[in-house]
Amino acid sequence: MEMTNAQRLILSNQYKMMTMLDPDNAERYRRLQTIVERGFGLQMRELDREFGELKEETCRTVIDIMEMYHALHVSWTNLKDAQTIDERRVTFLGFDVATESRYLSYVRFMVNTEGRYTHFDAGTHGFNSQTPMWEKYQRMLSVWHSCPRQYHLSSNEIQQIINA
């Protein structure tokens, strides 16, 4: 992240204020303040991640993935023979924190801040699937979108989606 000295000074002052306003996270803000003040290039890359951008199209895709899992779970609940499909297969896992952190951050924002999909179980890892999921979800979405009744899926349709 390239910043002028003036921008670094402004951000440093913001971190200093946050240290006073949020004592529980003061150590984190002091660390970031030091990084910005001294311009440590390697650590400045952390700010790129914090101030990253998620395009509107990507946000819509993440919401679509979450909506697909909502539809899968609702459909699974309505099945007469739901035992044939393990509930864990229709439960949203989230995204990999190591490789898909921007998507994971958006999911957490949608659930914890926006109050959407609050019925999803974050598990002990807070929607960290611990394995890359983006490509899998893309295949699943393709199958789900081809289903005529996306919220009234049959057992066979659910199987096709989760096995995509």
Curated annotation (Swiss-Prot):
| Gene3D superfamilies named in the record | Helix hairpin bin, yfbu gene product, domain 2
Give one Pfam hit by family name.
YfbU
InterPro entries registered for this protein in UniProt: UPF0304_YfbU, YfbU_alpha-helical_sf, YfbU_helix-hairpin_sf
Q: Which residues form a coiled coil?
A: none
Q: Which family does it belong to?
A: Belongs to the UPF0304 family.
State the HAMAP family in the record. UPF0304 (MF_00762)
What is the protein's given name? UPF0304 protein Ent638_2838
Question: What is the species listed in this Swiss-Prot or TrEMBL entry?
Answer: Enterobacter sp. (strain 638)
Q: Recite the lineage of the species.
A: Bacteria, Pseudomonadati, Pseudomonadota, Gammaproteobacteria, Enterobacterales
